[in-house]
Amino acid sequence: MILGIKSLRYIVVVATIAFGFTGLAQDKTVNDGVFTEALVSAGQVVYDAQCKTCHNMRFYRDTLRSWNNQPLLYLWESIMGTMPADNPGSLMFEEYTDVIAYILSENGFPTGEAELDPDNGMDSIAIVAP
């Protein structure tokens, strides 16, 4: 059976709509409650001990703006690879994740039931400017 041009166009349009909406449904942003209050509490402890000396929340507001529409995982990797400045990568993976949750919370993003995990889904969470 050979498909006509109209049939082929119809299939392409239907497939584009179906797959397009499926893709949109899977995308999350930091506005979607992608971290818990427990992560925020743990992150504040790490932030106060490791970050506060050099970085205030104004710094992070500007940082989040510069990462707008980028995956949250990229910011996590950047912070892990460069901080603390005197010993980059020296914190535990969970501590970097906790700090990210604290930074997001302090910039007005909502908590939720989801646990942030750099190995599971953080690459599909988009940063949006506060």
Task: Give each language-model segment a name.
Residues 91-130:
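Flexible coil segments in periplasmic/lumen-exposed cytochrome c-class electron-transfer proteins
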Residues 43, 47-57, 99, 103:
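The canonical Cys-X-X-Cys-His
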Residues 2-12:
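Bacterial N-terminal signal peptides that target proteins for export
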Residues 24-46, 87:
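Electrostatic cytochrome c docking/interface patches
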Residues 41-49, 61-73, 92-93:
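Sequence context surrounding c-type heme c attachment/ligation sites in exported
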Residues 72-82:
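Short microdomains enriched in Cys/His and/or Lys/Arg
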Residues 10-20:
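Bacterial N-terminal signal peptides
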